[in-house]
Amino acid sequence: MSPITTSKMSNFRWVICALLFIATTVNYMDRQVLSLTWKDFIAPEFHWTDDHYGTITGLFSIFYAIANLFAGKFVDWMGTKKGYLIAIFVWSTGAVMHAGCGWVAMQMEGYDSIEALRMVQAGSDAAVAIATISVWLFLSCRLILAVGEAGNFPAAIKVTAEYFPKKDRAFSTAIFNSGASVGALAAPATIPLLARSLGWEWAFIIIGVLGYVWM
């Protein structure tokens, strides 16, 4: 292999590493949208309590843990590129779907606006019904999100094994892993602002669409 070809291949590897970093950043931002919007924006509409939120986050962790058991095998079976793209598509779709939970709950309960849901008397049978339906809707979206997000690290690790020589694998792995910390820091700086200015639904949509853009 000529020096020029070797140099191009080396540069290409680091472009791939940058893409892995971005994907991991988006991965961690997607999962934090709910935690940063539920208290001030979602709970008043759906009459959630801390118990409702705890149920959703607890089951998401269980979904994610179980999905991790199969994600690596799925990537091996599908191939790195196809498996990674499917994982990103699934988690991005799950993220965007959260935005429709309010509309679906409104239709199922026969209300004509989201504001009408908010105006229901707290503690009433109607409020309990709204909370129950919305929790199930969000759980469905969290399940899809968890299944997709579980594929990120197995796929990213396999990419580094396939594209990087042993001498660079630890460093490239450290770079894409840092996306988790960057995503955790970027989310609180951006998501509440999006929710306040555009509505919590758009926070889910915009962050979710970043995954589609990556693809």
Across the structure, where does each feature detected by a protein language model lie?
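Cytoplasmic helix-loop-helix junction between adjacent transmembrane helices
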Residues: 141-181
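Extracytoplasmic
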Residues: 15-50
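C-terminal ends and interior cores of transmembrane alpha-helices
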Residues: 89-131
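Residue-level signature of mid-helix packing/kink "hotspots" within the transmembrane helices
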Residues: 32, 61-69, 184-185
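Extracellular/periplasmic helix-loop-helix junction of adjacent transmembrane segments
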Residues: 37-65, 112, 116-123, 130
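Helix-to-loop junctions at the C-terminal end of transmembrane segments
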Residues: 67-79
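Helix-loop-helix hairpin linking two adjacent transmembrane segments in secondary transporters
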Residues: 176-215
